[in-house]
């Protein structure tokens, strides 16, 4: 009996110590969060935006991921330095002052300038990645499927009625068994002056995509439509977060892996695609080569 009492006493002491340590850690985390919030509130608007962007879920995945070359998770020295400077909006000195399009060349301009085709490449690489991931869990995955023609259906005024309208990806059985799910990708730059907050950035682009395609997909294709809105800094809109959560769940079940590991892998893949695209927009040549 004495031995049992001693054992129970030791267990209680361990639990007490553990609970105390957890309480202290929780208090410290809360203190740091409150301190960070105060700093953010008192910072200039531009700094507030940088801090908000840097703290978004998924925006720092490339910093914490293992540098696995076979997964494409490695960066060379200049790429890493550029990535850190982009993340914190630090000055980058060795870039042109004027873009080939004639505008002043800044980081913000580099992310949206269509000369050189980097904006289209960024979109297509994300589209292809999402299609690749959907192929793991869906049947009949198509890239750029053509939508069926409109034949008398009543659509909202903003719908895309073009006879050759396409969306980025179609897969069967994602949200519901045997039902077609359509997805359309958009990448936006969150530092545009017209945006007031990150929530507004995502809402604007998601609503625009839904206005163009949601009713047509629902009424004619009898499918579901999900806009996948990303930012150049690695963030995602609510619809995109919900989609990736479902994707990770399905992939984890299919591969027999745990959800957290699968989600981390998916986030890392999307994070590095966005990061490499941003680095290409910053450093890539926008001059068209002349035939020899």
Put a short name on every predicted segment:
Residues 216-222:
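Arginine/glycine-rich "motif VI" loop of SF2 helicases in the C-terminal RecA-like domain
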Residues 229-292:
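Domain-level recognition of nuclease-like catalytic cores that cleave nucleotide substrates
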Residues 74-106, 129, 133-193, 202-208, ...:
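Active-site metal-binding core of divalent-cation-utilizing nuclease and nuclease-like domains
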Residues 1, 188-191, 233-236:
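Short acidic, S/G/P-rich loop/turn micro-motifs used as interaction or catalytic elements
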